Amino acid sequence: MVDFAKSLFGFGNYKKESSSQSPTPPPSAHSSQEQHHKSNTEEYPQSHLSQQQHSHRYQPPHMSEQSHQFPQQQQQQQQSGTNKFFPKTLVSAAPTTAVANHSSVYGTTSTTTNNYPEAYLNQTFKNNIYNPQQQQQQQAQQPPPEQQQSSAPYQNSANIQQPYGNQWGSSQDQDANIITIDKTGNKLSPASRDSPIKGKLKVTILEAKDIFATQPYVVCSFESSEFVTNAPDSYGKSPVSSFGHNNNQGHNGPRNMYNSNHGPSPKALPMKNSGNLFGQRPSMYQRQLSTPHLNLPNDSSNPIWNHDTIFDVVGSKSELDISVYDGARDDAFLGHVRISPSTDKNNKNESEWLQLGARITGETVSSGHIKIKWEYTSFDNNIKRSYGPDDFHFLRLLGKGTFGQVFQVRKKDTNRVYAMKILSKKVIVKKKEIAHTIGERNILVRTSAASSPFIVGLKFSFQTPSDLFLVTDFMSGGELFFHLQKEGRFNEDRSKFYTAELILALEHLHDNDIVYRDLKPENILLDANGHIALCDFGLSKADLNMDGTTNTFCGTTEYLAPEVLLDEQGYTKMVDFWSLGVLIFEMTCGWSPFHAENTQQMYKNIAFGKVRFPKDVLSPEGRSFVKGLLNRNPKHRLGATDDARELKAHPFFADIDWDLLRAKNIPPPFKPHIVSETDISNFDTEFTSENTSALKRQMEMATTPLSPGIQANFKGFTYVDDSTMDDHFARSYRANAFRPPGSFIPGDPNLPPDEEVLAEQIEEEDEMEVDEDQHMDDEFVNGRFDL
């Protein structure tokens, strides 16, 4: 026991035997682990609330006035001026995510240094286990008299810098042998081989009527992609509406479009349990609705936008969600409508008026209508379906990490805004992270195909001889960490809302045999409506069933479960629930429950320390929930019996309607302020303020291309056969060794097992040279430290 304690807390040289060259935690003495498998709790006054010191993210100067002192700890001025939930030992550390605020592929979090990669995904997609009911809009109202419309359509900004231009060629002309599977896991015939994109949906927001708003704007969501209109081009007149009510009716409050007795038109969004009276709604939503969301102005407005957008279509029965907000009144929600455009074949819907309604029974909304039109165009064999860097305009840098950078980009053919993660192959091979990098892409493909509503979707993956590219939906609300840092902490209802949506995301991953392993605020994104999306699967592991274990020592220090540090037999998916307990404690209390001045003490706190709850912050049900998640014995931890379903049944969530939550019909407690689809105000200015022209010059100064043998490590990342990559590499190398050559179409989930990749990696790694300034010291990456 003495030797073990010395080795754990830095007083000895004990190391766990492993084939990995990376630092791994020592095994535990079972007797000591049994004695400390539960978290003891203490309370102290709320005056001791504090915000932890976090290092890698910029914090505005005014934030220092909002933070509280940690008990028995003097406030210290950091060189970066940052306050984070990370220990001070990480002040000079590189960011653990490549994204200051982004999508699931945004992060570039990596695993333990020199750790041998985990197994690849050895299977294709599973059947979709999440099949929400598609709620088809059935309205057939007569349009009102035509109003004045602006002739100026929405135009893209003309002064956007474009770092890359056309210096990277395309490989679209190559006829590769492609293996493709559909959403259900069935292999497609050669005739139907293509990228995941099956067509495009053009949506035009024309105008609205009887909207009680001063600065209305519209958020359109389709398959996790978002479009935010600018301010209206003009406003029409406000005569008595042809819908049978005048504008003065709003003075007494808008009518609830979901009352069954209201009006002749059907509901735009059928609601489960919509027959419940407001008095029968769960208490959480009674509290939310007790404060009016909408203070109506005296006169209604008829905004005219004529703004259109094009969505890349992946699914066949996806919903288009249209929500209207008022930017002049703290983004007040005015109403929304959902329709399901037919995407089975070419289809066109002329303009129609849709009635705006509430998201939940009893919610106050405007009594207006919105006029839209849409057109779906299916791709045929003559349409280009191979993509590369030259198919995107690069707008802004969003984040940097160990392996690369994340950009906000605009797809040239559709003007759709995405997030693009660019990973350096040289750095990946040097750090022996090939398997985890490709594994991240595989998990994104699998989760995107299963249409999980709370996981960022992967739209494209391709590669050049020097880099890997992952293109995902852009989440304009930024990282949850950005908002947590700004506000210090959240109230219990807001924390509960985010936790509940995270439980649904983890439930989806665990049911698909995926353990996440890196849950933290930096890896949780907010969309334009305020819902969460889980991102960054660089540390995730697939093919881990309920009883399966894994041994890789990875994650972020403050969120590591004790069994990762102590159990030589490995750990299970229960590590995600431990991290969830740490996260909800941070959100509600404002600091990490296991914070310490140094890493060794933090490990000790995780293994044996007490959790101290501040007074009057968490309800008894909330404390019980956190204690259940922070049980040090994973076999007794909340969720050990029935995974996420056990968490959902906890009394803490007694007021949650999980069906409504899964359908995103519960109003989020917070709506990010968004002014346009390219708005980056919710992202860290440390990254977004960088000059993209300078980044362009850095990217153009390509390093020496990799050999064909090393390139073989990345086979399977795209939909090309083994020879295409080498042939393309050879041609591009002869043409210009310092010009990043062409790119390829999105990737194939059928990848080689890690044994093949590892063999290639070991043979070729000695041929590589990587500039030392491309990566930080290993000990400062992702909180990985020697025990």
UniProtKB/Swiss-Prot annotation:
Protein keywords: ATP-binding, Kinase, Nucleotide-binding, Phosphoprotein, Serine/threonine-protein kinase, Transferase, Virulence
GO terms classed as biological process: cellular response to oxidative stress; cellular response to starvation; chlamydospore formation; development of symbiont in host; filamentous growth; filamentous growth of a population of unicellular organisms; filamentous growth of a population of unicellular organisms in response to chemical stimulus; filamentous growth of a population of unicellular organisms in response to starvation
Bias kind Low complexity: ranges: 132-155
Ligand binding (ATP): L398, G399, K400, G401, T402, F403, G404, Q405, V406, K421
SS bond partners: none
Domain AGC-kinase C-terminal: 654-729
Sequence ranges assigned to domain Protein kinase in this UniProt record: 392-653
Disruption phenotype: Leads to reduced cell size and to sensitivity to rapamycin, caffeine and sodium dodecyl sulfate. Attenuates the virulence of in a mouse model of systemic candidiasis.
Function: Protein kinase that is part of growth control pathway which is at least partially redundant with the cAMP pathway. Plays a role in filamentous growth and virulence. Prevents hypha formation specifically under hypoxia at high CO(2) levels. Required for chlamydospore formation, distinctive morphological feature of the fungal pathogen C.albicans that can be induced to form in oxygen-limited environments and has been reported in clinical specimens.
Protein name: Serine/threonine-protein kinase SCH9
Species this protein is from: Candida albicans (strain SC5314 / ATCC MYA-2876)
